[in-house]
């Protein structure tokens, strides 16, 4: 694959382009499901933008953690290709979303359920961006795909990760819309378990230059270790959610903040304008209907 293309003299990074595709996809999902969660269009836009920024922040934090961990393991000789690790978006997003729930006027669990399918769609898009950009590539494979950065063919591990993550998105949407006994706040841990199981498997086909990357701890790669940790956390999350009544019933939103009030004012303002427009149109239709009735009576006479 080629990491960049040139259109009308401008060079475009395919990796960054897939992030844009992911953001648009997440917004569309949130837009289509906003009525189900009783959310206005302004809230949908604010939530989508915040989630995207929080995801980038989480990926950046994890990038520094990953670099530091491998630098220690290598004795200070590790030179990272990138300081952004998208796994961090999944791990740190609940923290950022919990903080946001204290100000936005919606509960943490509702917020997570609303954004979860879109979050995993961005992840799927980002992994496909890795394929196009030639990073995070798999082991050498003569039957694989050509990597322009390496000038040889490799196993398309990014493609399979992307497809598996898209499958996770579909499963989450089916659960959200079809499952009758699903508890609010369940979608994210379910998605984490499904994604991390797939990630753990596909890590066996990823290429690592150094032995300390391939065998970081107990024969696992760094990301396999975090996949296991994430699965354990997600299982605990679900157990608490389904078994501890006091936890699942508590309202984590302390009150309406200035941010929530401002968003609602924008929403109510646009809603009021729409109501006035509809009322004016209704009056016009009523007038036309009366005119038609009067004309019909005159013609009969």
Language-model features: locations:
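A feature for loop-to-transmembrane-helix boundaries and adjacent hydrophobic helices
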Residues: 1-301
């Amino acid at each position: 694959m080629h990491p960049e293309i040139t259109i009308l003299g401008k060079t475009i990074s395919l990796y960054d382009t897939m992030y844009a595709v992911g953001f648009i996809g997440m917004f569309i999902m949130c837009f289509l499901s906003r009525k189900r969660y009783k959310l206005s269009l302004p809230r949908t836009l604010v939530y989508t933008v915040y989630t995207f920024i929080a995801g980038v922040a989480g990926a950046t934090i994890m990038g520094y953690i990953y670099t530091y961990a491998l630098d220690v393991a290598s004795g200070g000789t590790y030179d990272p290709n990138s300081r952004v690790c998208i796994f961090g978006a999944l791990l740190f997003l609940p923290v950022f979303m919990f903080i946001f729930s204290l100000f936005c006027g919606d509960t943490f669990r509702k917020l997570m359920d609303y954004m979860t399918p879109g979050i995993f769609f961005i992840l799927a898009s980002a992994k496909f961006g890795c394929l196009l950009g030639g990073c995070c590539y798999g082991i050498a494979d003569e039957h694989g795909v050509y990597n322009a950065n390496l000038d040889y063919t490799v196993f398309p591990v990014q493609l399979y990760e992307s497809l598996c993550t898209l499958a996770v998105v579909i499963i989450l949407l089916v659960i959200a819309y079809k499952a009758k006994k699903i508890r609010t706040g369940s979608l994210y841990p379910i998605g984490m378990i499904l994604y991390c199981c797939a990630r753990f498997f596909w890590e066996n086909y990823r290429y690592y230059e150094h032995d300390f990357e391939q065998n970081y701890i107990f024969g696992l790669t760094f990301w396999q270790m975090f996949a296991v940790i994430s699965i354990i956390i997600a299982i605990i999350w679900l157990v608490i959610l389904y078994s501890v009544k006091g936890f699942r019933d508590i309202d984590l939103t302390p009150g309406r903040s200035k941010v929530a009030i401002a968003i609602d004012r924008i929403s109510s303002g646009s809603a009021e304008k729409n109501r006035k427009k509809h009322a004016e149109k209704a009056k016009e239709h009523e007038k036309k209907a009366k005119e038609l009735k009067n004309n019909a009576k005159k013609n009969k006479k």
